[in-house]
């Protein structure tokens, strides 16, 4: 015998089900110059700012700029892709004394930034600050005009990676970091950090930054392992070092392949505990070409580099006992 369900019970059950059902999934959302942050961030009704769109998108989803405009600074705490298609210039002009993009996400979260132009306007602190997350990919981006503030270190950087622990992978490709008051791309762990890091910097230009072009500085580490490959890239016209690797207690390995380093005060500088492998590269027009203070000598040159026409070349300090295995 079948018992009918009273209508009141049916309506109550349906109401509870609807209340507990998840909101409509938004795996992809949109921003546009004509958008409104009260909109649902769909293609037909886009939002106005990146921050509202990032808040609206599902974890692991994508935020896409429909047209060229400035879309405001962002704080990211989940996996997300933020992209600007070819022909669209999605900009972020950061606020004075602040960062354009701050990332503090979960240990397995992947963050992808593609086709963005970040400008500090001579007053903002940093372009991208990565404090926590699983991976960071920066592709086809421009980071410029961020300001060094001597009372707030580190500032003035195009990209600042400062993880304290955990495992991090980063890839920076086809990107330019220029005219920043600090360093173009700076890896500098927070105090007491011991992260495990695997990074790639490829087809990158770090030019006319006040301090360094690319710096892998493990001075605050108490352990961990950092492996970074720099390939097919240019570090030029930087006020201090074109490329730096060293300091701290982490196991630090930096491979430099087919890089051009010119017009810097120092071309390439390495200090203990860095292991540096240099091949197929041109170091010229610097005040000092290479400066090696690793002990024991772990700055290896493979005989296929052109270290010439610097104020002081410095190549005699390199380890030419070639590693062949």
Regions found by a protein language model. Name each.
Residues 8-17:
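Bacterial N-terminal signal peptides
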Residues 24-26:
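Boundary of Sec targeting at the N-terminus
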Residues 33-66, 70-72:
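Acidic Gly/Asp/Thr-rich repetitive segments characteristic of extracellular carbohydrate-active
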Residues 51-57, 70-78, 82, 101-105, ...:
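Short, T/G/N/S-enriched strand-turn elements that build extracellular solenoid repeat scaffolds
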Residues 79-127, 142-151:
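Right-handed parallel beta-helix/beta-spiral solenoid domain characteristic of secreted/periplasmic
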Residues 86, 109-120, 135-149, 166-183, ...:
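Right-handed parallel beta-helix
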Residues 94-104, 121-130, 151-164, 179-193, ...:
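Extracellular beta-strand/beta-solenoid scaffold signature
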């Amino acid at each position: 015998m079948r018992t009918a369900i009273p209508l009141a019970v049916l309506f109550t059950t349906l109401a509870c089900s609807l209340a507990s059902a998840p909101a409509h999934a938004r795996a992809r959302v949109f921003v546009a110059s004509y958008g409104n942050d009260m909109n649902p961030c769909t293609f037909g009704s886009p939002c106005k700012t990146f921050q509202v769109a990032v808040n609206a998108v599902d974890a692991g989803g994508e935020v896409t700029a429909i047209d060229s405009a400035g879309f405001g600074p962002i704080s990211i705490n989940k996996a997300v892709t933020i992209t600007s298609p070819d022909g669209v210039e999605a900009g972020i002009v950061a606020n004075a004394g602040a960062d354009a993009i701050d990332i503090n996400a979960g240990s397995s979260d992947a963050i992808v930034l593609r086709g963005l132009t970040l400008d500090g306007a001579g007053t903002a602190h940093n372009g991208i600050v990565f404090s926590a997350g699983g991976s960071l990919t920066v592709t086809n981006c421009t980071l410029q005009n961020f300001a060094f503030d001597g009372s707030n270190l580190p500032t003035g950087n195009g990209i600042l990676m400062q993880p304290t622990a955990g495992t991090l992978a980063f890839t920076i490709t086809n990107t330019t970091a220029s005219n920043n008051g600090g360093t173009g791309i700076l890896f500098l762990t927070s105090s007491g950090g011991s992260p495990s890091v695997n990074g790639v910097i490829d087809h990158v230009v770090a030019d006319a930054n006040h301090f360094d072009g690319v710096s892998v500085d493990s001075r605050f580490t108490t352990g961990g392992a950092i492996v970074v490959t720099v390939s097919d890239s240019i570090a030029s016209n930087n006020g201090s070092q074109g490329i730096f690797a060293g300091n701290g207690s982490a196991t630090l390995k930096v491979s430099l392949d087919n890089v051009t380093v010119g017009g810097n005060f120092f071309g390439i500088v390495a200090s203990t505990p860095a292991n540096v492998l240099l091949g197929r590269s041109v170091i010229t027009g610097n005040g000092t070409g290479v400066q090696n203070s690793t002990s024991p000598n772990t700055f290896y040159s493979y005989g296929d580099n052109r270290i010439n026409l610097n104020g002081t070349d410095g190549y005699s300090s390199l380890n030419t006992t070639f590693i062949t295995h």
